[in-house]
């Protein structure tokens, strides 16, 4: 049999509240061609996620309305729950409840960059920690769509300074394997120590120590 995956984006039209909202769609087909040259659909699955835009309509008294999204959305909060960082459709967002401010922290695709190059989804964003002030440490794993590491595969470690609203790259560890093998490796071991700012990460079967304080790494 043959397996096919289609990925594309659609936009709703009309006069409803959902008009002009963007959605990422993924369709999976498993097809078998019989001896009679007939094709048979063995399996089909379709998922659709709303592309979060951070507009004021996404906020209410209950919190952040992310729209159509996976139920296991990855997020981290500070201790008192006034600041939350969450990942939706390969974008990292930051919301400060006290200041009522929503910020797009990281995403290869944004309002100014929505071409084929930036929409390639062969990477994952993973939250490492969120401190009391909302400063966030996170990693980007896989293919780098744009930026100084464009075209490379690896693990980038970033630090978001909430007060300055700025993102700084702390380290980049290149990998030789593709995205899927790297994703499996990182799932086996990733650990961050807040006290000494050390990140331990497994890449291509090698365990790396990345110190975010002095921007160094060692095997």
Question: Predicted segments — roles?
Answer:
Residues 73-95, 126-150, 155-157, 188-203, ...:
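Short beta-strand elements that form the blades of beta-propeller/WD-repeat-like
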Residues 15-17, 49-57, 96, 105-106, ...:
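A short, polar/proline- and glycine-enriched secondary-structure boundary/capping micro-motif
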Residues 17-73, 101-103, 162-178:
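Short beta-strand edge/turn micro-motifs at domain boundaries
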Residues 105-115, 119, 170-173, 218-219:
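Trp- and S/T/G-rich repeat-edge/linker motifs of beta-rich repeat architectures
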Residues 69-76, 114-131, 178-191, 219:
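Repeated scaffold domains used in trafficking and secretory/extracellular systems
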Residues 46-47, 94-101, 114, 138-139:
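Extended, regular secondary-structure scaffolds
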Residues 97-100, 161-163, 211-215:
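Short loop/turn segments that connect beta-strands within beta-propeller blades
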Residues 1-19, 123-132, 136:
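Surface-exposed, charged secondary-structure patches
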């Amino acid at each position: 049999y043959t397996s096919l995956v289609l990925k594309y984006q659609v936009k709703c039209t009309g006069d409803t509240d959902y008009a002009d909202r963007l959605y990422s769609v993924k369709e999976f087909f498993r097809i078998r061609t019989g001896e009679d040259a007939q094709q048979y659909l063995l399996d089909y699955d379709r998922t659709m996620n709303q592309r979060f835009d951070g507009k004021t309509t996404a906020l209410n008294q209950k919190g952040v309305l992310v729209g159509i999204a996976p139920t296991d959305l990855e997020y981290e909060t500070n201790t008192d729950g006034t600041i939350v960082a969450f990942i939706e459709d390969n974008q990292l967002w930051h919301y400060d409840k006290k200041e009522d401010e929503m910020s797009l922290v990281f995403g290869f695709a944004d309002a100014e960059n929505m071409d084929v190059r930036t929409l390639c989804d062969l990477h994952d964003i993973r939250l490492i920690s969120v401190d009391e002030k909302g400063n966030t440490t996170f990693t980007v794993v896989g293919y780098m769509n744009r930026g100084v590491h464009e075209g490379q595969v690896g693990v980038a470690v970033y630090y978001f300074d909430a007060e300055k609203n700025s993102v700084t790259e702390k380290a980049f560890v290149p990998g030789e394997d593709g995205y899927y093998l790297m994703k499996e490796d990182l799932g086996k071991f990733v650990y961050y120590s807040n006290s000494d700012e050390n990140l331990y990460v497994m890449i291509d079967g090698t365990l790396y120590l990345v110190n975010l304080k002095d921007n160094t790494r060692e095997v």
